[in-house]
């Protein structure tokens, strides 16, 4: 996965990219772990917002992105006007980041909680996406139509997906808009 906990201690300066195993100095902590993320939609989003809707999402309400450009393009293809917004992420080490390296029992429980309306305390959550098919399996599991074991048998054959939700206003400050592509 492109985003690893170790990357939280990758300091970025204007002159060079400096990788350190020591905890960075206070000034260096402000901008860390630079990477590119994409958001697919129907318009360019220069100033992302956390929109609270009636639909429950995998990791709760927030601004969703991915490191997989093709996935953002698939998200955009749902609309008449197809736009992929591009951002640099400069992670603030003070934020609470929850990362799921793969679809695990903990990942499933977290998504079930979020899709049931339960709030969490993380600023950013990273992990696999429950696409439409996986979502149907999760719904069947929640409804008791299939067991947990049956869920995993069905889910393990899906292709990899990735999502990052910026859940708080502080998390949104990590995003620096670079531009967009109209598809």
Q: Model segments located where?
A:
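Conserved NAD+-utilizing ADP-ribose enzyme module
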Residues: 3, 17-34, 45, 58, ...
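Short aromatic-glycine-(Arg/Gly/Cys) micro-motifs in beta-strand/loop hairpins
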Residues: 35-57
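Short, conserved beta-strand segments within well-ordered enzyme catalytic domains
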Residues: 37-39, 64-65, 85-88
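Extended catalytic/binding region for NAD+/ADP-ribose chemistry, centered on the ART fold
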Residues: 54-77
């Amino acid at each position: 996965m492109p985003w690893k906990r170790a990357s939280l201690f990758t300091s970025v300066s204007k002159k060079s990219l400096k990788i350190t195993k020591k905890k960075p100095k206070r000034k260096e902590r402000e901008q860390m772990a630079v990477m590119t993320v994409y958001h697919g939609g129907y318009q360019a989003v220069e100033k992302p917002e956390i929109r609270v809707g009636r639909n429950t999402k995998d990791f709760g309400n927030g601004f969703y992105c991915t490191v997989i450009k093709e996935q953002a393009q698939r998200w955009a293809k749902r609309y008449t006007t197809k736009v992929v917004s591009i951002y640099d992420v400069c992670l603030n080490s003070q934020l609470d980041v929850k990362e799921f390296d793969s679809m695990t029992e903990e990942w499933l429980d977290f998504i079930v909680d979020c899709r049931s309306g339960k709030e969490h305390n993380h600023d950013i959550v990273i992990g696999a996406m429950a696409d439409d098919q996986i979502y149907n399996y999760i719904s069947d599991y929640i409804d008791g139509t299939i067991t947990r074991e049956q869920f995993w048998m069905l889910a393990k054959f899906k292709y990899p997906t990735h999502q990052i939700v910026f859940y708080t206003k502080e998390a949104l400050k990590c995003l620096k808009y670079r531009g967009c592509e109209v598809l």
